[in-house]
Every structure is written in structure tokens, then in C-alpha cells.
Amino acid sequence: NGMFQLGRIEKLHDYFSACSRRREQAVFFYRVAGYSGEVAAFLNQYDQAARTNGVVIEGRIPNPDPKQLDYLAEMMGSDFQLDAGFLTQKLTRWLPRLTGVQREAVVTAMTATLQDLQAHGKNENMLRNAYIKYMCWLYYKFERILGRLGGDELPKILYDGTVSSYELQLLVILARAGADIVLLERAGD
């Protein structure tokens, strides 16, 4: 179906294995709460990997500002449809550097995530707002790693903070499209 499956790690170090060497060639998405010496060493290494080939988010991803929203509307119009054809057309214009395979992965992942929201009773306007956030964040925050989605050396995302529901949805999209994710919650549960 064009989406990466979330895999299970045996040990933290599995995060650093190439995609082709993993069972089911899966991505990893884990929440880390609580520390030990081993976890601290892993996080240090993962942080370095994310800085080299990925994105480190400390705190929150800022909401799109008025300039970013205006630019999106100017470039893409303000219409929205929960439809793979519509999303493909929009992503082709908005993120032209994605390969066809990467674009399809992002579209499939975004469609699945928006359908999940719809199944949980979110209305058209809420879905449109989610779509606008995703598009702005992909462009302004994650654009430099999108071209590496699904490669053998998967891009790494480290989210260090308390994740919001929109942010979590976007991280799920990125994982489904071919990125490894670690959510670090220092406050624990």
C-alpha cells in the first residue's frame, strides 16, 4: 500500500541499522520516557544522527505564522479535499523535489492519517485545518529531509518535548512515509 509499517526493535541500537537490513524493512517510532545509562548513550547517538540526517525538535513545532499561511494559500489555493488525487496534485506543486515514490508515500500516509481523524468524528473544517498545518510544517520544518524518506539510511527525527495531537499526527505521517522517530518525554508520564 506504499506505506512503511512500524517495526519492533529488539534493542535500541536497531535504530541505526540500514532499512534493507531490518525485518520487514520497517520504520521505528518509539516514545522514550525515563532514563538509564544505556538510554542516555542511545539518545546521544540518535541526537547526532538526527542532526546529520534528520531533524531535532526541541519544545514545540511553532504554529504556521500568517506569512506562511498566506504563502500556502497564494501558491495552492484554499480548497481542500480528502482525496489522494487532490493531495498528489497539491504536493507536486508544493514540494516539487519529492520523487514520485516519495510523493506517493507522503500522500498515502497523509490520506490514512486524515481518514483516521475523520473516523474519530473530525469534520471537514478540522480536516482542512490539519491539512494546512501538515503542509506548512512539511515545507518549513521538514523540507530538507523529505528527499531522504524511504532511503536505505532512513532520516531520523528526534522530538524532545511534550507533543501536541497535530504534531503527533504529522510524525505518524513522516513515519508512514519512511522516517524513524523518537519521542523523548523528559517529564515521563
Task: Label the model's feature ranges.
Residues 1-13, 19-135:
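Conserved N-terminal ligand/cofactor-binding loop architecture of enzyme catalytic domains
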Residues 12-22, 142-151:
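Short boundary motifs at domain starts and secondary-structure transition points
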Residues 116-189:
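Active-site and donor-binding regions of nucleotide-sugar-utilizing enzymes
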